[in-house]
Design a protein with these regions (language model features):
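Karyopherin-beta/Importin-beta family HEAT-repeat alpha-solenoid scaffold
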Residues: 1-333
C-alpha cells in the first residue's frame, strides 16, 4: 500500500497481476485465519520489539485494503467488467468476492467475548466510530467500494451467495457475517441516497426472519438491525412487512434475554421512525417511548456514564420517537 501511494504510476500497469495475486493469497489464507481467530482464540494485533506487526490478522488487513485499492485501477476494472459481461450471478467473480468478504467478516472469538459483556463496544463498532480497524470492517469497506462501482451486480452477488450460505450447514457466524456485509452496503446506500431494488429487498426477507428466531444472540441482533436498514433503503418495497418488523423490534426490547439484542432493537427503531409514514409510527409512539424508558430504568446509571455510544443510541431513538408528535410527549410529562 505504501509503495502504491508513493509510486502509483509505476504500479498501475501491474495492478491486474497484483490484484489476482492478492485475491489468490487471501483465498489460501482463509482456512488458517478462520481456525486461529474465528474458531480458536489466538491473540491478534501483535507487534515485535521494533513495533512491526507479525500476526496473520495484520497481513489479512493489509491485503484486503490493497484489494480494495486495486478495484480503482483502470486495468483491473476493464478486465473485470469484460469478464462480468459473460457471467451470471451464480458464477460471477462478484459472487466470489462476496464469499471471500463474508469469510473474513465473521465475528472473531475475541470480538465475541468483548461484545457479549459490553454492548457499548459492540455499538461503537456498529457505528464505525472506533479506531479499531479490523478485517471485518475492511470487508465492509471492500463491499461498499464494489457497490459504488457495480451496484446491481454487487447486490445480486451478495444475495446469491447468501442464499447458498443459508441453504447449507454453515454456522451462525457465517450467516451473521453475510447480513453484516449487507448492512454495511445498505448504510452506504442511505448515505448517498441510493435504494436497493424491490426484488433484491424481498429476497432478503426470509433470511432476516430466520435470523430473528435463532438462539444465538449475535445473529438475532443482526436480523433486527438489517430489517431496519432494509426498510429504510428499499422505498415502498417492504411496506407490507415493515410494520411487523417494527413491532417485532419493539416487543424484543423488554422480552429478549440478551442485552445485545435489546440495544440492537432500540437502534433499529431509528431506521423505522425515519422511513415509515406518520400513520404507521404515530400509534406506536407511546409504546416506543415506554420501552426505552423501561430499558433505561433497568440500567445501572453509574455504568451508563462510561457507555457513551449506548447513551447516544438511547437519546437519538428517544428524540426520533418524540418528534413523531410532540404534543403526546407533552401529555406524558404531565
Amino acid at each position: 500500500m505504501r509503495i502504491r501511494s508513493v509510486f502509483p504510476a509505476l504500479l498501475s500497469p501491474q495492478s491486474l497481476v497484483l490484484f489476482q495475486a492478492t485475491w489468490q493469497e487471501l483465498s489460501l489464507l482463509e482456512p488458517a485465519y478462520s481456525l486461529m481467530y474465528i474458531h480458536e482464540d489466538r491473540q491478534s494485533r501483535l507487534e515485535d520489539a521494533d513495533g512491526l506487526p507479525y500476526t496473520l490478522d495484520f497481513l489479512i488487513l493489509e491485503e484486503l485494503d490493497f484489494m480494495q485499492a486495486c478495484l480503482r485501477a483502470p486495468p483491473v476494472r476493464a478486465q473485470l467488467e469484460q469478464e462480468l459481461q459473460n457471467q451470471t450471478p451464480e458464477n460471477s467473480w462478484v459472487t466470489q468476492v462476496m464469499k471471500l468478504a463474508v469469510a473474513y467478516a465473521q465475528i472473531t472469538t475475541e470480538e465475541e467475548g468483548l461484545w457479549d459483556v459490553d454492548v457499548n463496544v459492540f455499538l461503537s463498532e456498529e457505528t464505525s466510530v472506533t479506531a479499531n480497524y479490523t478485517p471485518r470492517t475492511a470487508c465492509g469497506d471492500l463491499v461498499i467500494k464494489l457497490g459504488e462501482w457495480l451496484t446491481e451486480p454487487t447486490v445480486n452477488g451478495l444475495l446469491t451467495y447468501t442464499r447458498a450460505l443459508y441453504s447449507g450447514s454453515e454456522g451462525w457466524k457465517a450467516k451473521e457475517a453475510a447480513l453484516y456485509v449487507l448492512n454495511q452496503l445498505l448504510g452506504d446506500f442511505q448515505d448517498v441516497d441510493k435504494q436497493i431494488g424491490p426484488e433484491a429487498a424481498s429476497g432478503y426477507v426470509d433470511f432476516i426472519r430466520y435470523a430473528m428466531q435463532q438462539p444465538d444472540a449475535f445473529l438475532r441482533a443482526r436480523g433486527y438491525l438489517v430489517a431496519g436498514s432494509l426498510t429504510r433503503t428499499s422505498g415502498d418495497a417492504l411496506q407490507q412487512l415493515s410494520t411487523s418488523f417494527l413491532e417485532a423490534s419493539l416487543q424484543a426490547i423488554p422480552s429478549d434475554e440478551s442485552d445485545l439484542v435489546q440495544v440492537s432493537c432500540i437502534r433499529a427503531l431509528q431506521y423505522y421512525l425515519q422511513a415509515l409514514p406518520h400513520a404507521v409510527t404515530q400509534p406506536l409512539q407511546s409504546p416506543i417511548i415506554l420501552a426505552i424508558s423501561n430499558y433505561l430504568a433497568a440500567q445501572d446509571m453509574s455504568e451508563l456514564n462510561d457507555s457513551e455510544d449506548l447513551m447516544i443510541t438511547l437519546v437519538e431513538t428517544l428524540r426520533d420517537a418524540i418528534h413523531i408528535d410532540t404534543r403526546i410527549w407533552t401529555c406524558l410529562l404531565y
